[in-house]
C-alpha cells in the first residue's frame, strides 16, 4: 500500500493541490476555500500516476476482494479506473453525470450486470455529490456498489453525512488532514496558516481567511 503521506507529497509536488489561506479560491458552490485541487494533473506524471494506480489497486484488493467491476466517475475518474482495472484484471466501466441525450441514452458505459459487485473510483471528494449520483445510477442498473475509493478527500462535514445517508463507505488514498500536515512538515505553510486551514475543514461555510 502506498502511504497516504506519499500521495499527499505527490499532489503538492506536481501542483495538483494549491494551498492559499491568505488568498482563498471561490468554488463553483460559492464557498470560499483555502485550497484548490486539480487531480487531472496526475495523469501527466508517470510516477505519480503509478503511485495512485498501485495504491487504489492495493486498497480495492484488500478491502473489496469480491469486486467484479471497477467503475470510474466521468470524467476525472475514468483514467484511474482503467489503470486500476488493468492491474486487477477486472472489467471496467464508467458512469456519466446523466444519460446521453442521443443514441441508446446510456449513462453507464462498459459491461455491467445485476450480479456485479462494483467499486467506484473518483479523483476528488468534496461533498460526494458526483460519486453518489454515480452510485445511484449503478444501483438503478441492478448492480451492487461495494464502496467508493478516491485519490483525495477534503473530509468536509457534508461529505460524511452524505456518505452515511447513502449507506456507502469512502476510502481515499490521502486526506486533507494528511496533506496539510505534510505541507507544514515541508515548510510550505506557516503555523498561523495551518490553524486557518484546520478551521476551514471544521466550518467551511463560516471560515474567514487569515
UniProtKB/Swiss-Prot annotation:
Pathway: Pyrimidine metabolism; UMP biosynthesis via de novo pathway; UMP from orotate: step 1/2. One of its GO terms (biological process) is pyrimidine nucleobase biosynthetic process. GO terms for molecular function: magnesium ion binding; orotate phosphoribosyltransferase activity. NCBIfam families: pyrE. Orotate binds at residue 126. Belongs to the purine/pyrimidine phosphoribosyltransferase family. PyrE subfamily. It comes from Levilactobacillus brevis (strain ATCC 367 / BCRC 12310 / CIP 105137 / JCM 1170 / LMG 11437 / NCIMB 947 / NCTC 947). Catalyzes the transfer of a ribosyl phosphate group from 5-phosphoribose 1-diphosphate to orotate, leading to the formation of orotidine monophosphate (OMP). This is Orotate phosphoribosyltransferase. The gene is pyrE.
Amino acid at each position: 500500500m502506498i502511504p497516504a503521506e506519499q500521495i499527499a507529497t505527490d499532489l503538492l509536488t506536481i501542483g495538483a493541490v494549491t494551498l492559499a489561506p491568505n488568498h482563498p479560491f471561490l468554488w463553483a458552490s460559492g464557498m470560499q476555500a483555502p485550497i484548490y485541487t486539480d487531480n487531472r494533473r496526475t495523469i501527466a506524471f508517470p510516477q505519480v500516476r503509478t503511485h495512485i494506480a498501485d495504491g487504489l489497486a492495493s486498497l480495492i484488493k484488500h478491502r473489496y476482494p469480491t469486486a467484479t467491476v471497477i467503475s470510474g466517475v466521468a470524467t476525472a475518474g475514468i483514467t484511474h479506473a482503467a489503470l486500476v482495472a488493468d492491474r486487477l484484471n477486472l472489467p471496467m466501466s464508467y458512469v456519466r453525470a446523466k444519460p446521453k441525450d442521443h443514441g441508446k441514452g446510456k449513462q453507464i458505459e462498459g459491461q455491467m450486470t445485476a450480479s456485479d459487485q462494483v467499486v467506484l473510483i473518483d479523483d476528488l471528494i468534496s461533498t460526494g455529490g458526483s460519486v453518489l449520483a454515480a452510485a445511484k445510477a449503478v444501483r438503478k442498473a441492478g448492480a451492487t456498489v461495494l464502496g467508493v475509493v478516491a485519490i483525495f478527500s477534503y473530509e468536509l462535514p457534508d461529505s460524511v453525512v452524505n456518505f452515511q445517508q447513502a449507506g456507502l463507505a469512502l476510502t481515499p488514498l490521502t486526506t486533507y488532514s494528511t496533506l496539510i500536515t505534510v505541507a507544514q512538515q515541508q515548510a510550505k505553510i506557516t503555523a498561523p496558516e495551518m490553524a486557518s486551514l484546520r478551521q476551514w475543514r471544521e466550518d467551511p461555510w463560516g471560515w474567514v481567511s487569515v
